[in-house]
C-alpha cells in the first residue's frame, strides 16, 4: 500500500510540473503576441498622424517622420506591404 501511495504522489507531482510548464509556455507566447500588437498599434498610430498632418493645407513634407516610421517598421521586422507609405 505504501508503494502505491508513493507512485501516485510521484505521478501527481509530474502532472503538476507538466501543467506549470505548459502554462509558462502559453504565457510566453501571449506576452510576445501582446508586444507585437503594441508595436503594430504604435506604427499604425504614427501613420495615421502622418496622414492627418499631410491633409492639412500648411503641411511641408520634410520626410523626417516618415523615415522614422519606416525605420521603426523595418527594425521590428514588419515586411507587410500594407505598411508602405
From Swiss-Prot:
Gene source species: Human immunodeficiency virus type 1 group O (isolate MVP5180)
One cellular component term (GO) for this entry is: membrane
Family affiliation: Belongs to the HIV-1 VPU protein family.
Indicate where this protein resides in the cell.
Host membrane
GO molecular-function term, one example from the UniProt record = CD4 receptor binding
Keyword Acyltransferase included in the entry's annotation: no
Q: What does this protein do?
A: Enhances virion budding by targeting host CD4 and Tetherin/BST2 to proteasome degradation. Degradation of CD4 prevents any unwanted premature interactions between viral Env and its host receptor CD4 in the endoplasmic reticulum. Degradation of antiretroviral protein Tetherin/BST2 is important for virion budding, as BST2 tethers new viral particles to the host cell membrane. Mechanistically, Vpu bridges either CD4 or BST2 to BTRC, a substrate recognition subunit of the Skp1/Cullin/F-box protein E3 ubiquitin ligase, induces their ubiquitination and subsequent proteasomal degradation.
Q: How does it assemble?
A: Homopentamer. Interacts with host CD4 and BRTC; these interactions induce proteasomal degradation of CD4. Interacts with host BST2; this interaction leads to the degradation of host BST2. Interacts with host FBXW11. Interacts with host AP1M1; this interaction plays a role in the mistrafficking and subsequent degradation of host BST2. Interacts with host RANBP2; this interaction allows Vpu to down-regulate host BLM sumoylation.
Swiss-Prot/TrEMBL GO biological process terms: receptor catabolic process; symbiont-mediated suppression of host innate immune response; symbiont-mediated suppression of host type I interferon-mediated signaling pathway; symbiont-mediated-mediated suppression of host tetherin activity; viral release from host cell
Which ranges of this chain reside in the Extracellular compartment per its record?
1-7
Q: What is its main location?
A: host cell
Ranges in the topological domain labelled Cytoplasmic: 29-85
Q: What is this protein called?
A: Protein Vpu
Q: What is known of its domains?
A: The N-terminus and transmembrane domains are required for self-oligomerization and proper virion budding, whereas the cytoplasmic domain is required for CD4 degradation. The cytoplasmic domain is composed of 2 amphipathic alpha helix that form a U-shape.
Q: What else is known?
A: HIV-1 lineages are divided in three main groups, M (for Major), O (for Outlier), and N (for New, or Non-M, Non-O). The vast majority of strains found worldwide belong to the group M. Group O seems to be endemic to and largely confined to Cameroon and neighboring countries in West Central Africa, where these viruses represent a small minority of HIV-1 strains. The group N is represented by a limited number of isolates from Cameroonian persons. The group M is further subdivided in 9 clades or subtypes (A to D, F to H, J and K).
Designated gene of the protein: vpu
Arranged from A to Z, the UniProt key words for this protein are: AIDS, Apoptosis, Host membrane, Host-virus interaction, Inhibition of host innate immune response by virus, Inhibition of host tetherin by virus, Ion channel, Ion transport, Membrane, Phosphoprotein, Transmembrane, Transmembrane helix, Transport, Viral immunoevasion
